[in-house]
Amino acid sequence: MKRWKAIWLVIIVALFCIAAQAQNQGQSVDAILDDSFRSMYNLQFDQALSKAEQAKQVDKTDPMPWVAQASAILFREFDRLHILRSDLFASDDAFSSRPAYSWVPASRKQFDDAIAGGEKIAQDRLNRDKKDVKALFALALFNGLRADDAALITKRNLTALSYTKSSTGYADKLLAIAPDYYDAYIATGMGKYLIGGKPAPVRWMLGTTPGFSEWKCEPLSSCHLRPPGPQ
């Protein structure tokens, strides 16, 4: 059961890495995405979606704005359903007894459309270049988003595990090409923990105020997460 409590971390952790990466790169699309993810973590979903749409217009061949869009829609639904309240993850019993929820139909369609649109862009990129790391990373994240939906909203545990395996598969392909693409280790490490039940050094604090404690994944000491803001 502990692995099911961890499944939601796959995409949430990876998305925070994207925000930090965007700030460091300083590129136009990435800078806009940085604003989008920060707005999302601050529960400013309209602003997050507006920034994601802006990034889509800057580069229509980049799947990452679609990741940001789908993420904001999913987090908005989490917030509406109070899914990320801390007591849900306080114990195995609390998590296993969680109910299955229903999406707002319009939001469900927005989420599915965002993922479908982004996956098409990513697959088109892979058709041109099988080693396109951005496409592989986006596909890993899209499957992670689907896993979070299945695990935390609709409570389809086996479906969530299937999406997690797919996410890990794309991340493994990426790392075979670019072993220094550290963000992808999050998906593989968490995925292998969920599938194999091996211990994972995960620390997470999630309360009423959006934010994160420092998170480190081994064996890569270079993979860190810190709260938003200047360091």
Indicate where each model-derived feature is located.
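Bacterial N-terminal signal peptides
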Residues: 8-17
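Acidic donor-binding loop at a coil-to-helix junction in glycosyltransferase catalytic cores
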Residues: 64
